[in-house]
Amino acid sequence: MDNHSSVPWASAASVTCLSLDAKCHSSSSSCSSKSTASSISASPETQTMRHIAHTQRCLSRLTSLVALLLIVLPMMFSPAHSCGPGRGLGRHRARNLYPLVLKQTIPNLSEYTNSASGPLEGVIRRDSPKFKDLVPNYNRDILFRDEEGTGADRLMSKRCKEKLNVLAYSVMNEWPGIRLLVTESWDEDYHHGQESLHYEGRAVTIATSDRDQSKYGMLARLAVEAGFDWVSYVSRRHIYCSVKSDSSISSHVHGCFTPESTALLESGVRKPLGELSIGDRVLSMTANGQGVYSEVILFMDRNLEQMQNFVQLHTDGGAVLTVTPAHLVSVWQPESQKLTFVFADRIEESTFFLLRDGQSGGGGEKQVQQNGIHWYANALYKVKDYVLPQSWRHD
């Protein structure tokens, strides 16, 4: 017994054998069996083993329950249409990436068109009010040449910083041990002619840390995939990239409706969204176009003070719909008799969209600016580019 007492598992095994053997005894040895059982129950080693066995059974049941939930929960959810995500981490990476060729640009348009990086907004100097909108980039995965010694090459617009950080990650994945090199970003010395997005912090010239020119075609492709709005394989020595201004795309990140926009409650009362409360049941729509009342359970991103750009859609019946450019609008296609969803800023004249009173209409579109409310958290915009198809995103 001394040996058994020094080895817990051996002692427990002996007790278990005694317990099983006691069950096989006749009633004439019941007293000795009971005394053995009492000594067994009093053994701390036995209690420990029973506790371990019970814990293992509980863990096994918990694992089975979790596995069951993982199978059942996806069946309980159904897809829903929501506002289009705006700025994010870039575009879906294609399976086969082809490098750009020298002098190629993507898109094949003028850099200053709205479909590319957009028009110039004005030079930003250190004493300009907009200078505070530039942000420094201290990403350790990016090398900055900073030949001026002023840190100017680290300054850029918020959107440019986002895309550059994504590109830096892609470069490390494509060529382990190689880092992204920024040779020029915001420029205050007017080295780029009279018109350049470098003066606004919206453009960068880039290369790889090893200066291997054979990589630059693929580097340009990675920049396109990272989400830069205009990429040019402008020279054998570097790649040029630029982005839209932060002001032109801010409405894609915040806002959905104005605080004055109203929601129809189940009671029949119209309530401004700025006064909407958790628990209110508002009119919404199912996937097949049926109106249902749904409970408001959460405001994940609500800002009643921030100014944003909105689109106003006017119908021939006099109705006005005010939403952000990336908001999805229910559009009716008479030719195919189908209901689709289109981003608000892509709706054209004579388009039919659904209104609550059953009327449909189409009309002009104009931009307005005021405060807005958004239903979704910013975190969703950080992951949307990796989970949504390109056609679903509002860039």
Curated annotation (Swiss-Prot):
Ca(2+) 2 binds at residues 148, 184, 187, 189. GO terms for molecular function: calcium ion binding; cholesterol-protein transferase activity; morphogen activity; patched binding; peptidase activity. Its EC number is 3.1.-.-. Residues 26-43 have a biased composition (Low complexity). The record marks 255-256 as: Cleavage. It is found in: Nucleus; Cytoplasm. Residues 27-82 form a propeptide. Residues 26-46 are annotated as: Disordered. Residues 1-26 form the signal peptide. PANTHER family: HEDGEHOG, PROTEIN HEDGEHOG. Interacts with shf. Belongs to the hedgehog family. This is Protein hedgehog.
